């Protein structure tokens, strides 16, 4: 598991899962390709806003924006990929009188991002918007089983509207 953007280890106190600090990709290893650190205000990494629907709030308060890819060089086999997202730019709450409204790309109030995600050049999430699916400042995770051949697993991101981003990533080998 990777604590995207962070320079620190993070341990989930319930599962004892240790999240590794982020790093740029180097051949024979793993890491991000492209993108930059999200800063809500100058000099501060991430946001201090509460992120809902997760017990690991610090993991979701940072993100890599405009990310191109995340690559892992690893042995061939079957893996589970889990991506974690929280749109920290999108509007976080709907007002009471507007609860029935549905966020759409055409809505003038929509401030979220929409992007495509592929794994090893196979489309996975098309026109994906965490803000439309769950709202702003809320965690959403997406899982996929992948058969790796050729020694690498690459998750690619392509912007449709706004920017691509990633808050966290887990890769587990399935035995």
Regions found by a protein language model. Give the residues of each.
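Compositionally biased, intrinsically disordered or flexible polar/acidic segments
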Residues: 1-175
